[in-house]
Amino acid sequence: GDYLQWAAFGIGFYIVCNWIQGLRIRDQVAFELIFKSKALLLGLIAFPFITFVTYALGAFGPAFYIRNFSMTASEVGILYGLITAFGSMVGVIGGGFLGDKLREKYINGKLYLIMASAFGTAITGLGFLYSSEASVSFTWKFFYHISSTAWLGCAASTVTELVLPRLRAVASAFFILMLSMGGLALGPYLTGMLSDIYTIQFLAEGTNESMAEAIGLKQALAQSLIVLLVPIILLGFACRFLKKDEDNLFA
């Protein structure tokens, strides 16, 4: 399974590299704007680390509640689905609205919101993972979904604002591709692998199987939140270059 995962990822990475090289040959202007804009490049590197966490916690969220709170799949499905849908809706809409308001006052307003979203995702993620009661955990989970989706609109609009109008579809496509390669392809896989490692360790220490699986998954999900430091740091640097890159766009 591991070989197949990395083979598929390697093929995808090779295709992406070929696409970038092809863009450089076919459209030098597009290549320059996308890959030589420091603010845009830092953003494109930073954003997948957020989806690394959200895809991982999304993939193993139901299993976490089943293992740690002894809930049935149907109970988790109803509560988890409703909280995810409503919380994400509030996060996406509210994040976009607030991001536009911040942008009116600060040139880096949208980047500030994305960094706050990453920080809030870490705090609320720890909140729902380490709550002792299911009701408290699901309350944290609701706020987690608000925080973990609030950044999406600001990230997408920042990408399109840093390229010419004719290149917005290409830049958006690469943005989505980076989210998929870094987040969807690696987040659940690496977190699941870490969970298996912890589970084996706990079993070797004499912990019963159900408890070992519950604690192992909880620790793996909690430790995946550490990667949220990366986008906060990278976007902090991006704030230094955003205004200059926007000014150079139509210069």
Go through the PLM ranges and name each one:
Residues 1, 16-44, 68:
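Juxtamembrane intracellular "pre-TM" segments in multi-pass secondary transporters
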Residues 1-6, 72, 107-112, 196-228:
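A membrane-interface helix-boundary motif in multi-pass transporters
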Residues 1-3, 38-95, 148-152, 156, ...:
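Extracytoplasmic gate region of multi-pass secondary transporters
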Residues 36-44, 134-138, 169:
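Primarily residues marking transmembrane-helix entry/exit sites
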Residues 73-78, 165-175:
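Loop-to-transmembrane helix entry/capping segments in MFS-fold secondary transporters
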Residues 103-105, 159-168:
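Paired intracellular helix-loop junctions of major facilitator superfamily
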Residues 107-158:
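C-terminal transmembrane helical hairpin of 12-TM major facilitator-type secondary transporters
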Residues 122-131, 217-251:
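Multi-pass alpha-helical transporter architecture, strongest
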